[in-house]
């Protein structure tokens, strides 16, 4: 059989599966009149580690604080913060993690994994059908968006789907494959086709909202930018609290330090979209400088697939006045480590150019200024010489370190800007911007299409 015959057959089978399931599971999911005064219920879904999905945890917390029942769905892994675990209105549903325990070939395992994920997600959402809202993180796009569309069409038609766009899934795939690769093209089509039909689209930057209109033809009236903001547990530390942190972690992170040391902190997932060579080369320039500079203690938090490569490069550097420590921290300890630092560093290089690094938001929440690798959307968060410095390459980063730590006035200036950022919290932003979408509070701002120039002449009827 010709290759295109196989392709057509697979497409027909894929489209037939939801129809068959619909016929087998169809029920009237409308609320009876006796239920209309009950609490509203929202499903918060992320096909990822819940404990490492802070923005979705913040959504769940905000919804519960506003009186919604929340079904929080995702992988078991890192421990979420206590206000999630101890909230009677939040029920956690763990999605089983699919591992390649049989050592199958990559392609074979990938196909079987996606099929299994379809079944797990459909089964979970069928059990939770009838919710008022379904709030979904994207990416990952496949198979999440297709399953969510099926759920909304066939299992729970009354549910309003809200997609929270953190990035574009197809651009992440394009880090590994050429943009012209058939898989990247399919991923882009899939993301636009299934993702474009939501009730509302949240996105992390204004620039991303504009790209969603241009790339996927979405209506600007349904796009609401929601910048990440620091949650309640990220806050500036007093001098006594900083001393407590230095004492509590003296044996592991702050050993052999003097009062002259300056502390830099960075968080990384050790993945290709974060080039840690920029930081290491910048630190090498700082170390080689003939200027009278203070010694540095650099704390790198996080874990990921490229961590062994990073540690090997650190070992080769043999720096004299720069020492590097790595750590994987508990949720409660991470804000404390940030708050004790003099400067934060972000190595995030966006695959799309449209998202923003959550780590910078966390650092601002703790009142520490940030040096960040520059890209298109970064200016929506980092304002050079106001709350941080945007740099291109290791030379600019190294020179920035030297400038800030040899001129206290410059560091103090951006420190003041970071402290101002710490006052603009997630709770304040969420209630004003997102709350009304979930029937919480009242609109207090302009329509998104007017405020951000997202106006569109396209019809919303098919959304």
From Swiss-Prot:
The chain crosses the membrane at residues 4-24. Participates in the formation of the lipid-linked precursor oligosaccharide for N-glycosylation. Involved in assembling the dolichol-pyrophosphate-GlcNAc(2)-Man(5) intermediate on the cytoplasmic surface of the ER. The lineage of its organism: Eukaryota, Fungi, Dikarya, Ascomycota, Saccharomycotina. GO terms for cellular component: cytoplasmic side of endoplasmic reticulum membrane; endoplasmic reticulum. It is an enzyme of class 2 (transferase). GO terms for biological process: dolichol-linked oligosaccharide biosynthetic process; protein glycosylation. Coiled coil: none annotated. This is Chitobiosyldiphosphodolichol beta-mannosyltransferase. It is found in: Endoplasmic reticulum membrane.
């Amino acid at each position: 059989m010709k290759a295109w015959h196989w392709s057509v057959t697979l497409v027909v089978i894929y489209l037939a599966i939801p129809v068959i399931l619909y016929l087998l599971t169809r029920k009237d999911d409308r609320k009876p009149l006796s239920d209309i005064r009950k609490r509203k219920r929202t499903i918060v879904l992320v096909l990822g580690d819940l404990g490492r999905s802070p923005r979705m945890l913040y959504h769940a917390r905000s919804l519960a604080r506003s009186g919604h029942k929340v079904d929080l769905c995702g992988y078991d892994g890192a421990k979420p913060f206590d206000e999630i675990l101890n909230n009677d209105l939040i029920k956690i549903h763990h999605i089983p993690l699919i591992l390649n325990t049989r050592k199958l070939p990559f392609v074979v395992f990938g196909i079987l994994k996606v099929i299994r994920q379809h079944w797990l997600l459909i089964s979970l959402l069928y059990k939770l059908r009838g919710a008022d809202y379904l709030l979904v993180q994207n990416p990952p796009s496949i198979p999440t968006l297709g399953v969510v569309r099926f759920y909304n069409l066939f299992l729970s038609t009354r549910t309003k789907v809200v997609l929270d766009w953190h990035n574009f899934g197809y651009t992440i795939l394009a880090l590994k494959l050429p943009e012209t690769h058939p898989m990247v093209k399919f991923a882009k089509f899939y993301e636009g086709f299934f993702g474009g039909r939501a009730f509302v689209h949240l996105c992390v930057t204004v620039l991303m909202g504009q790209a969603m209109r241009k790339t996927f033809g979405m209506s600007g009236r349904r796009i609401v930018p929601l910048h990440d903001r620091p949650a309640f547990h990220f806050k500036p530390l007093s001098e006594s609290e900083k001393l407590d942190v230095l004492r509590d972690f003296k044996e592991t992170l702050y050993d052999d330090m003097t009062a002259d040391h300056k502390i830099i902190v960075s968080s990384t997932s050790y993945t290709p979209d974060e080039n840690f060579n920029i930081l290491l080369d910048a630190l090498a320039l700082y170390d080689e400088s003939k200027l009278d500079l203070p010694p540095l203690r650099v704390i790198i938090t996080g874990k990921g697939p490229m961590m062994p490569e990073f540690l090997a490069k650190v070992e080769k550097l043999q720096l004299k006045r720069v020492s590097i420590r790595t750590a994987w921290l508990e949720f409660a300890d991470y804000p404390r480590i940030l708050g004790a630092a003099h400067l934060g560093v972000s190595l995030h290089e966006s695959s799309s150019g449209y998202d923003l690094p959550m780590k910078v938001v966390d650092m601002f929440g703790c009142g520490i200024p940030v040096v960040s690798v520059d890209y298109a959307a970064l200016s929506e968060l980092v304002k050079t010489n106001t709350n941080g410095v945007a740099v291109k390459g290791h030379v600019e980063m190294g020179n920035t370190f030297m400038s800030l730590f040899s001129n206290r006035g410059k560091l103090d200036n951006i420190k003041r800007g970071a402290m101002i950022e710490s006052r603009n919290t997630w709770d304040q932003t969420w209630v004003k911007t997102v709350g009304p979408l979930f029937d919480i509070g009242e609109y207090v701002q302009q329509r998104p299409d007017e405020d951000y120039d997202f106006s569109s002449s396209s019809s919303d009827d098919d959304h």
